[in-house]
């Protein structure tokens, strides 16, 4: 692998990695979080032993980075209940279903919920308009020939974009 490729975060040194691994291995046996982290680390090492193609490794790496980012975004809202709403990105604002989605989202916000949609237009936009930007998450998947996020959620820190799903 070329080490000159641009990275979003610098790689930790071998000493830093070993230090983190030692801390993990020294965790008490009854530490559930440490046990899960050990399993994740073992799985990652098995990926190396599997001799995967470089493109497969890049997919795994990107997917893990995207998940870590999404967890950081959602973490600040752990105390809020959320409802995921699925629907067509092609539903027009004059469609009765658009209006129903808008009203439903407005009503669930009154009950203390936030909405999660794919973040595009159609039903997704109706839900985010009904809930308002402050009560909306967009979980967008980059697809060829698809539209971007709707105006309500675009450029919002609660818009999370995934390449892989």
Give the residues covered by each predicted segment.
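Glycine-rich beta-alpha loop segments
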Residues: 2-150
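Conserved phosphate- and dinucleotide-binding cores of soluble alpha/beta proteins
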Residues: 146-165
């Amino acid at each position: 692998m070329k080490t000159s490729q641009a990275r979003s975060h610098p790689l930790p040194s071998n000493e830093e990695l070993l230090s983190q691994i030692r801390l993990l291995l020294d965790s008490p046996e009854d530490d559930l979080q440490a046990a899960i982290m050990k399993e994740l680390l073992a799985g990652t090492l098995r990926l190396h032993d599997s001799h995967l193609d470089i493109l497969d490794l890049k997919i795994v790496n990107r997917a893990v980075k995207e998940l870590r980012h999404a967890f950081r975004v959602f973490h600040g809202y752990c105390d809020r209940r959320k409802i995921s709403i699925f629907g067509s990105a092609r539903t027009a604002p004059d469609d009765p279903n658009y209006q129903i989605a808008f009203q439903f989202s407005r009503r669930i916000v009154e009950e203390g919920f936030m909405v999660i949609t794919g973040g595009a237009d159609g039903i997704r936009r109706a839900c985010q308009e009904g809930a308002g930007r402050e009560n909306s998450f967009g979980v967008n998947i980059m697809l060829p020939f698809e539209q971007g996020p709707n105006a309500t959620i675009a450029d919002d820190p609660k818009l999370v974009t995934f390449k892989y799903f």
